Amino acid sequence: MSGDGSCSYSAEEGIRELLQSAKAKFRESVDVAIKLSVADSKSGESIRGAVVLPKGLGREVRVAVFAKGEHAKQASSAGADVVGDEELIEEIKKGRRLDVDWCIATPDFMPQISAIAKILGPRGLMPNPKFGTVTLELAKMVGIIKSGQVKFKSDRYGIVHVKIGDIGFTPEDLLENFNAVVAAVQGLRPTTIKGSYVRGVFVNSTMGRSFRIAGIG
């Protein structure tokens, strides 16, 4: 979150300034950083959730599904990139790396998936009922994720980092994604916080400076 904190911009202005200042010779990512009045190391609270970016991520979102029988067929038909059962779990145990962004599982697979939790967990891939990724509605969930759903979690400093696109996006599309992320994070405000919840919001590109966004509390 480096940048000149003395200047603040509206979300629209900040995004336009960011795009104009991006000079790298590659397609830089655009990220939002939201500083919250929670810090895992002190309060034990963290903010975690998921949000569908209205304009997507600008790339394919890949999904793996653990299911069998008719549920596996539904997942495949819905566009899941990897579909497997116990055999897939065994392959992962032996070192197969899943090149995916999300994993979904039917509830009956969770006891078996626990055996690879130490593999999936650090990559943020463990199916979780809070994200709707432990479900029998596989086709629906695959569709939601493929449409551009992203996960987020506050770090130990109370900061949520989310990619909202890249410099190839229009300002309008980035603004839509930005607003969706901010609304999702604001909607998860803990009841234990009595004062200010959002302390600062910044947008930045991979190699560029950050721009502080005003008017978000």
UniProtKB/Swiss-Prot annotation:
GO cellular component, one term: large ribosomal subunit
Recorded superkingdom: Bacteria
Protein species of origin: Anaplasma marginale (strain Florida)
Protein name: Large ribosomal subunit protein uL1
Gene that specifies this protein: rplA
GO biological process: regulation of translation; translation
PROSITE patterns named among the record's database cross-references: RIBOSOMAL_L1 (PS01199)
CDD domains per the UniProt record, alphabetical: Ribosomal_L1
Subunit note: Part of the 50S ribosomal subunit.
Function (record text): Binds directly to 23S rRNA. The L1 stalk is quite mobile in the ribosome, and is involved in E site tRNA release. Protein L1 is also a translational repressor protein, it controls the translation of the L11 operon by binding to its mRNA.
InterPro entries: Ribosom_uL1_bac-type (IPR005878), Ribosomal_uL1 (IPR002143), Ribosomal_uL1-like (IPR023674), Ribosomal_uL1/biogenesis (IPR028364), Ribosomal_uL1_3-a/b-sand (IPR016095), Ribosomal_uL1_CS (IPR023673)
Family designation: Belongs to the universal ribosomal protein uL1 family.
Classification via PANTHER family: 54S RIBOSOMAL PROTEIN L1, MITOCHONDRIAL (PTHR36427), LARGE RIBOSOMAL SUBUNIT PROTEIN UL1M (PTHR36427:SF3)
Keywords (A to Z) from UniProt: Repressor, Ribonucleoprotein, Ribosomal protein, RNA-binding, rRNA-binding, Translation regulation, tRNA-binding
Molecular function GO terms recorded: rRNA binding; structural constituent of ribosome; tRNA binding
